[in-house]
Regions:
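Short, small/polar-rich motifs associated with maturation and membrane association
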Residues: 1-249, 254-269, 278, 317, ...
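Extracellular/periplasmic, surface-exposed regions of secreted and cell-surface proteins
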Residues: 3, 31-36, 77-78, 210, ...
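Short aromatic-centered micro-motifs
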Residues: 81, 481, 742, 793
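Surface-exposed, extracytoplasmic segments of Gram-negative outer-membrane nutrient-acquisition systems
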Residues: 186-190, 376-383, 389, 565-578, ...
Length: 946
């Protein structure tokens, strides 16, 4: 198979048997067995060393790819995407129908990625779409209908448990009696028969989705063509949420004569996304959508229908404005539109035999529009006097336009003589990127019926705009040589000049080299080890770069604000300008040095294939948002400081287990180990802390710490040692006959007046008092290893595909439990049902803090959980109709299939899904707060070719 398999290596293709670098290829047959709108969703666990994550399970293009560990701390860790030869720093895979993709190749080591120089440090994803073939037109239809639902939701308290909790918080006196003892429910026990509202039942739905793709491919004379149209309608499992995409693609290849060939590729996609923003950076937890879903009380003491209530009047709305989540989903208008256009045109001319000149030009445009409208039936549009978040009827419009222009010119030469095989390529590239952003926000719109058209009908409009541009000029070359397909050498060099840096630092040079020895082709091995069908040793070393910073970060920035920066002059205020950032003309790209040692083995005529790679990837001159001396006038600046190292082992095993006339069974297994270590930070800086913006109580409390000598982004807080028990106290009786508990001497405390049931944190310093000095590492969001396991079974006309995915050794900071298993003294807020096992005088051995607990609003190991999981990700069962059945219908092939996704998960994580990270970054991995749930889905599909 390796004899004919071709792999994209950037500016060319190479037979897999001749590879000297580390390149992983996706099995497109496996990836398209389950219908998805974005192929990235199916990549996780398929290729060793490639980690695919999403913040949550919401519909849309929210996927992140990290190759061989995060190569930056505060910079981007995303790979470079090259789609049909057009390089882009942002993924365009959401605009391509998976059925249009021919291959996906992942360049991992420096030998492979150095050809992309300053943008190759995080790896390269090369996507090649399907091209036209010779022969008469062939029409193919792919369609499916999908049903999705939420299988695993957290259980919340019922009416009785909720009211019992309120009694503990309020006491049994007048406040509780006034709020919860009513004519309808005269006693606490009466709530056993009360109607309990689980708001999840009202905001989740069974989502019905469908997608359709039709393509035509063939040739007419010397013109080869393929064209396709697709429509995808994906409903979200939260009401009023979903994504629709309209997409079209055309690929043309015209052979003008024996020397000249012209290619054209064009793709257009329009994507529309609706639905609430479930999780995002915010200063108040009450603005998170799932907060209202889980916290809204489950019972009405008066028997009124809570579904008709706009807000919960039982809470202090100046601190916790809890809005009806059903009305939020129904009435908040959230409409995002993305229009993406990409086309490439290229001409290849053979100057003399084996010497070819290729000239390409490309253009990409991305227009994005975000519309938000909040009427009177929404959180911020409602004018309740206690609603401190009210802006009246309000609207927001954000629009961005991004353009990219590309010209690339390559000259390639190939020579094969006797046992010598030589290939050389030289090239130059020019790319220009422009962006224009503008937004307007207005409040107190006079007439709600105007909708988004009322932007000019409000008061206090806030208008923002920005414009940017960057350019990249590059020269590059590569030489491949092998002798007798046994001894290989590859050398690559790229020089990049970027406008993102000052003139003295604009050019960077990125060399790489690799060697390989195909020892199984040596006669002394081939003659004595016939069972060894392939054996190759690979070694590579090289440098790549990362230039993912702003267009003008090396410059000092001036800003102005009429309200903040002004001074009196001649009796009136004149706007003032201030520096918002520090100039740094020494700024340059991050440089990543990578060493890779690989071994490829094949046994029994290719029935068993094993690939292993060990790598050490060191990034220096990190583009770090570093703390600087206050005497500079700034608190931080973007500097080239620090060093980060990733090292690991990747193993891929592919086997043909059984192969007979009627039955075959193939397996593919991959596992990747990665160790991340910070070698250095800013001069004299032993660590850096990171904060999560999700609530005011925690915005000044570090949640993560990154220490020199350890991996980045470890969870930070107190070690939780359970709750204080009665035996920790001396008990006395006061003059009123009330029991008084005083901590015994020598038992450390965090809050004065600690009582039984309060959280107990470990005194690491031994000072006898718990304080910030006792905080330490309490978890690690980075997995020890990740992987996947695929099985393909074929029996006669039936095919079965089963795919497992896993992650092991990573922790999750479950912020949902920090709120919903920790009410402290907060009234009228529902909790997870797990909180019924809290500490109470009747349950004094519980390690869950009591109601009204003191000192509980802290990051601690109580809320850090093992996020390891083994997931049965996909199953697909298909039937291929026999040709004799289809021939009378003029159909050449047809397959009907049933598939399921996110079927079952083995995990110790208490949340709805361990595959979550709502604040995903190298410094804050594994944070779970108010996620959009990941749906279980079943699809019925049809593939037909005419």
């Amino acid at each position: 198979m390796e004899e004919v398999t071709v792999v994209a290596v950037g500016y060319g293709d190479v037979r897999r048997r001749d590879l000297t670098g580390s390149i992983g290829s996706a099995n497109m047959g496996d990836l398209t067995k389950t219908p998805v709108s974005n192929i990235t969703e199916s990549l996780g666990g398929r290729i060793a060393g490639v980690q695919v994550s999403s913040g949550d399970g919401g519909p849309g293009d929210n996927f992140n790819i990290v190759i061989r560990g995060a190569g930056s701390l505060t910079g981007s860790t995303a790979p470079l995407y090259v789609i049909d030869g057009f390089p882009s720093e942002s993924s365009g895979l959401g605009s391509i129908n998976p059925n249009d993709i021919e291959s996906i190749d992942i360049l991992k080591d420096a030998s492979a990625t150095a050809i992309y120089g300053a943008r190759g440090a995080n790896g390269v994803v090369i996507v090649t779409t399907k091209k036209g073939g010779a022969g008469k037109p062939t029409i193919t239809y792919n369609g499916s209908v999908k049903v999705g639902l939420v299988k695993n939701t957290p259980e919340v308290m019922n009416a009785y448990d909720f009211v019992m909790l309120q009694q503990e918080i309020m006491g049994s006196g007048e406040e509780f009696q006034k709020n919860y003892i009513t004519e309808l429910y005269p006693t606490l026990d009466a709530y056993h028969n009360a109607q309990s509202y689980d708001w999840q039942d009202y905001i989740y739905r069974t989502a019905l989705s469908h997608n359709h793709h039709i393509s035509m491919t063939g040739s007419q004379g010397d013109l080869k063509y393929t064209t396709s149209l697709s429509y995808d309608d994906t409903q979200g499992v939260i009401i009023n949420s979903g994504v629709k995409r309209y997409q079209g693609r055309v690929n043309l290849s015209q052979k003008v004569n024996n020397k000249l060939k012209i290619d054209f590729t064009g793709n257009y996609a329009s994507t529309v996304q609706d639905g609430p923003t479930v999780s995002g950076a915010t200063s108040s937890m009450s603005t998170a959508y799932m907060y209202s879903v889980w916290s809204f009380r489950p019972v009405s003491p008066t028997g009124s229908d809570l579904l008709n209530q706009m807000y919960d009047e039982g809470v202090n709305m100046s601190e916790d404005y809890r809005f009806n989540p059903v009305k939020s989903a129904q009435n908040e208008y959230r409409h995002k539109t993305t229009n993406n256009l990409q086309f490439n045109i290229g001409a290849e001319y053979e100057i003399i035999k084996k010497l070819k000149l290729k000239v390409t030009a490309g253009y990409t445009s991305t227009d994005y529009k975000n519309e938000e409208f909040n009427g009177s039936q929404t959180r911020t549009g409602n004018s309740h006097p206690s609603n401190t978040q009210s802006k009246g009827i309000n609207a927001y419009l954000y629009q961005s336009e991004a353009r990219s222009y590309l010209n690339e010119n390559t000259l390639s030469y190939q020579l094969n003589k006797n046992s010598h095989n030589f290939n050389a390529m030289l090239g130059m590239s020019v790319q220009k990127n422009t962006s224009y952003i503008h937004s307007i926000r207005t409040e107190k719109i006079s007439n709600e019926s105007f909708g988004m058209a009322g932007l000019d009908k409000g008061s206090t409009p806030a208008v923002n705009s920005s414009k940017g541009e960057n350019k990249l000029m590059s020269y590059f070359g590569r030489i491949n040589y092998n002798y007798d397909s046994r001894y290989y050498i590859t050398a690559t060099m790229r020089a990049d000049g970027s406008s993102k840096f000052a003139r003295g630092n604009r050019w960077g040079y990125f060399p790489s080299g690799s060697l390989a020895w195909a020892f199984a082709r040596e006669s002394f091995i081939a003659e004595n080890a016939s069972w060894l069908s392939n054996g190759k040793l690979r070694f590579s070393y090289g440098q790549t770069g990362n230039n993912r910073i702003g267009n003008y970060d090396y410059m000092a920035h001036l800003i102005t604000d009429d309200d903040l920066y002004k001074y009196p002059w001649n009796g009136q205020f004149v706007p003032g300008y201030v520096l918002s950032s520090m100039q740094n003309e020494k700024l340059k790209w991050e440089t990543t040095e990578q060493l890779d040692l690989g071994l490829d083995l094949g046994f029994l005529d290719g029935r068993i294939n094993l690939n292993m790679d060990y790598y050490i990837k060191t990034t220096k001159d990190l583009l770090l948002d570093a703390d600087i001396s206050a005497s500079s006038g700034f608190s931080s600046a973007t500097l080239n400081v620090g060093k980060l190292r990733n090292s690991g082992l990747e193993i891929t095993l592919e086997t043909t287990n059984i192969k007979t006339k009627d039955f075959s069974w193939n397996s593919s297994f991959n596992i990747a180990f990665n160790k991340n270590e910070i070698i250095a930070l800013n001069s004299g800086q032993p660590y850096m802390t990171s904060y999560i913006s999700w609530d005011n109580k925690y915005k000044t409390t570090p949640a993560y710490i990154s220490k020199v000598g350890e991996s980045a982004g470890k969870m930070y807080g107190f070690i939780y040692d359970g709750t204080y028990k009665y035996e920790d106290f001396n008990k006395t009786i006061d003059e009123n006959g009330k029991e008084v508990y005083t901590l015994k001497e020598g038992i450390p405390y965090y809050v004065a007046g600690t009582q039984p049931g309060d959280p107990k944190y470990r005194d690491l310093t031994g000072e006898g008092e718990i304080n910030d000095k006792d905080k330490t590492t309490i978890g690690n969001g980075q997995p020890k290893h990740i992987g996947g396991f695929t099985n393909n079974l074929v029996w006669k006309n039936f095919d079965l595909n089963i795919f497992f995915q896993w992650s092991y050794g990573n922790d999750i900071l479950n912020a949902n439990r920090m709120v919903f298993e920790n009410p402290a003294a907060k009234q009228n807020t529902n909790m997870f049902a797990a909180y019924t096992n809290r500490w109470t005088p009747e349950n004094p051995t519980s390690n869950i803090p009591r109601a009204r607990a003191q000192g509980s609003n802290e990051y601690s190991s109580l809320y850090v959980e093992d996020g390891s999981f083994l997931k049965l990700k996909n199953i697909s069962l298909g039937y291929n109709f026999e040709a004799k059945t289809l021939k009378p219908l003029h159909i050449s092939s047809a397959r009907v299939y049933l598939s399921a996704e996110n079927i079952a998960t083995i995990s110790g994580y208490s949340g709805s899904d361990p595959e979550v990270s709502t604040r995903n970054s190298p410094l804050t991995p594994g944070f779970d707060w108010s996620p959009y749930p990941r749906a279980f889905s079943m699809s019925l599909g049809l593939n037909v070719t005419f």
